[in-house]
Amino acid sequence: MVRNPNLSKEEERLLKLREELKRKKPKFRRQEWHRYKKLGEKWRRPKGRHSKMRRKLKSKPKMPNPGYGSPKKVRGLHPSGYEEVLVYNPKDLEKIDPKRQAARIASRVGRRKRQEILEKAEELGIVVLNA
């Protein structure tokens, strides 16, 4: 039941642009992640003196740069356009603006409290992203 929030035309355009940019963005992986199992894929900046990746040679993987970022106005928003608010109990729902924000129930919330949160959210007309 994910409805779209009240977004301006500009914000909708920027959300679509962000989606396109993310599709084109390469997956930034650690240098030589494929060579040694113990390294893992998580990004680490190459610091070696002779590192081809650090020197940005043509054939080597790309490194993260500010140019890969998403537009400032829609940065951090859920793909639906809502601003996510983490909720731990039903009382937290009262602080949410249903027009711009959506709730995400915290992972450590149990089944009973989760049910209470869902009922109260429906009552207040708040979207729950992980319902």
From Swiss-Prot:
Q: Which InterPro entries does the protein's record reference?
A: Ribosomal_eL32, Ribosomal_eL32_arc, Ribosomal_eL32_CS, Ribosomal_eL32_sf
The keyword Ribosomal protein is assigned to this record: yes
Against Pfam families, the record matches this protein to:
Ribosomal_L32e
* Superkingdom of this protein's organism: Archaea
A single BP term in Gene Ontology: translation
Instruction: Provide a GO CC annotation, any one.
Output: cytosolic large ribosomal subunit
Question: Basic residues compositional bias: what residue ranges?
Answer: 44-61
Is the Lipid biosynthesis keyword given for this protein?
Answer: no
Which keywords accompany this UniProt record?
Ribonucleoprotein, Ribosomal protein
Q: Annotated region Disordered: where?
A: 39-77
Annotated GO MF terms = structural constituent of ribosome
NCBIfam families the UniProt entry points to = PRK08562.1
- What's this protein's family per the entry? Belongs to the eukaryotic ribosomal protein eL32 family.
Q: What is this protein called?
A: Large ribosomal subunit protein eL32
Which classification does the entry list for the species?
Answer: Archaea, Methanobacteriati, Methanobacteriota, Methanomada group, Methanopyri
